[in-house]
Regions:
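Cytosolic regulatory regions of ion transport systems
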Residues: 1-236
Length: 236
């Protein structure tokens, strides 16, 4: 019995005892860069967790991650082997308790159209499985990569919850065009906006409120180590 349990743990079939974690479905070519960005983003947290569910062997995933990432800072990376569209597998990685879910696309943009369509369909099935796991409750925010314009629209309208579907080629093409037509400073702005080096943006609302109406000038004194920002509309 002990050996069977040990073998199950090695295969990555056991329950994940986490909540408020970042869940990644799939283990593609960009997984290392995604993990690195998440590690950097999590440095402000004392104990953060990334859980990865993929059909790859758990030991292989662990070795690839260890070989490519040296410093995990405050983030623990947990891998599990399983099918990303399987409801029982999603329950084992506590999908409904995640703070956000990233669904990786298994096909790179240069692959044949048939392969891209199959990969997009798998992403859509994964999203529907996440919705099923949550059983009527609001699901965690989902970010996914989908190649087809039609399937991206379908993904974002398949649920009332938050689903953001991106197309790698479209996003990069727009950024490259804007950089080519602008001055060099735009590249610095993009780096600051999408990276986690230096200052970051946080949305904050104290549990006890602000103690009454505040002007923007009055709010500045409430922050010791950060700078408040806001939006000034035409109505003031």
């Amino acid at each position: 019995v002990f050996e069977a349990k040990l073998a199950e743990l090695r295969r990555g079939r056991s329950l994940v005892l986490e909540n408020d974690h970042t869940l990644i479905l799939g283990f593609g070519d960009r997984i290392i860069e995604v993990i690195k960005e998440l590690i950097e983003a999590n440095e402000s947290e004392a104990d953060a967790a990334i859980v990865i569910l993929a059909e790859d062997d758990k030991e292989d995933m662990d070795n690839i991650i260890r070989d490519n990432i040296i410093d995990f800072a405050t983030t623990r990376v947990i891998t599990r082997s399983g099918v990303t569209t399987n409801i029982n597998n999603l329950k084992k990685v506590q999908a409904e308790q995640a703070k956000s879910i990233i669904v990786m696309n298994s096909a790179s943009s240069w692959r044949p159209e048939k392969e891209l369509n199959l990969a997009d369909a798998l992403v859509l099935k994964s999203i529907m499985s996440i919705i099923a796991v949550c059983d009527g409750e609001e699901h965690p925010p989902i970010v996914c990569e989908i190649h087809s314009d039609r399937d991206r629209e379908l993904a974002e309208n398949i649920t009332t919850g938050t689903v953001k579907a991106l197309n790698e080629v479209s996003v990069l093409s727009r950024m490259i065009a804007q950089l080519a037509l602008s001055r060099n400073g735009l590249s610095v702005v993009y780096s600051d906006m999408v990276g986690f080096d230096g200052n970051e943006f946080y949305f904050y609302q104290p549990d006890e409120g602000w103690g009454g109406p505040l002007t923007f000038g009055e709010s500045i004194n409430r922050f010791k180590s950060s700078t408040p920002m806001g939006i000034h509309t035409g109505e003031g």
